[in-house]
A protein has these predicted regions:
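Patatin-like phospholipase
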Residues: 1-69, 77-263
Length: 263
């Protein structure tokens, strides 16, 4: 085929949002049956991970276990729903959304990143980044989304069994990604949650994969190997903002190991 033919073919198969007639999940051609796929968080560094997710989907790869924390949970749900369009737009498109945050949002106590808008009001049909819930819910994979429970100091993981509809998924993704100070605490079933990277693994759901019996893991990182987050320099900020949860949060901030370890 000529270059023009190839360009026409690319245009005709370009990913489109869920809800349009042309939308289709990326097909599965290869199953990696004994490997868990783990996505590290890292805020907008997840944009680079999203490019890898696109490559995995375009290659037709399927993993029986997919899990992530913080921005990693966004890549997790897009991988499981096999949505090439949303994989990119959930990060790149977000930068053009005027309601996504800023200092005005922070002053109004919605957070510097307006997590309520980002996670609860952009994913329904007809909204900015419609999510393919039917494909996600029907996926033959184990899914794990991790968040830090502030009142107990434990990392909590949710799976497909905990979510019956889209409205169950969205607050869990919000909780997993809510950075202290920059975003409000999220309450689920009456319990307070923040960014899952506050947990003991520092943002890697490798403990959840191991608990589910996986020994081999493909861990997609957003920091260099060996990176360690320094101890929190201003614990007083957290003391003022989270007095009832101080010990759990400060202990986590000062001891989290942000490396998945040898795998």
């Amino acid at each position: 085929p000529t270059p023009a033919d190839r360009l026409a073919a690319m245009s005709s198969t370009r990913p489109v949002p869920y809800g349009l007639p042309e939308h289709a999940p990326a097909p599965i051609t290869t199953r990696v049956d004994d490997v868990a796929l783990v996505f590290e968080g890292g805020g907008m560094r997840g944009t680079y991970t999203a490019a890898l997710v696109q490559v995995l989907l375009e290659a037709g790869l399927f993993f029986p276990w997919v899990g992530g924390i913080s921005a990693g949970c966004t890549n997790t749900v897009n991988m499981v729903s096999r949505d090439l369009w949303r994989t990119r737009e959930a990060f790149v498109g977000l930068t053009t959304d005027p309601q996504a945050g800023g200092w005005g949002s922070f002053i109004r106590r919605r957070g510097y990143f307006n997590s309520d808008h980002i996670y609860r009001h952009t994913s329904a049909p007809g909204e900015l980044f419609p999510f393919d819930w039917p494909t996600f819910k029907a996926a033959p994979a184990t899914v794990r989304i991790g968040s830090f429970r502030c009142d107990t100091g434990e990392e909590v993981y949710w799976g497909l069994e905990d979510m019956d509809e889209l409205e169950d998924l969205l607050p869990r993704c919000q909780a997993s990604s809510s950075m202290p100070v920059l975003m409000p605490v999220v309450h689920i079933d009456g319990a307070p949650y923040l960014d899952g990277a506050l947990g003991s693994t520092g943002g890697f759901a490798t403990d959840a994969a191991a608990a589910d019996g996986y020994e081999k893991m493909l861990v997609v990182m957003t920091r260099p190997v060996g990176y360690r987050k320094p101890a929190e320099k201003r614990p007083g900020v957290y003391r003022r903002l989270f007095p009832s949860n101080l010990l759990n949060i400060l202990s986590s901030l000062n001891t989290s190991d942000t490396s998945p370890g040898p795998r």
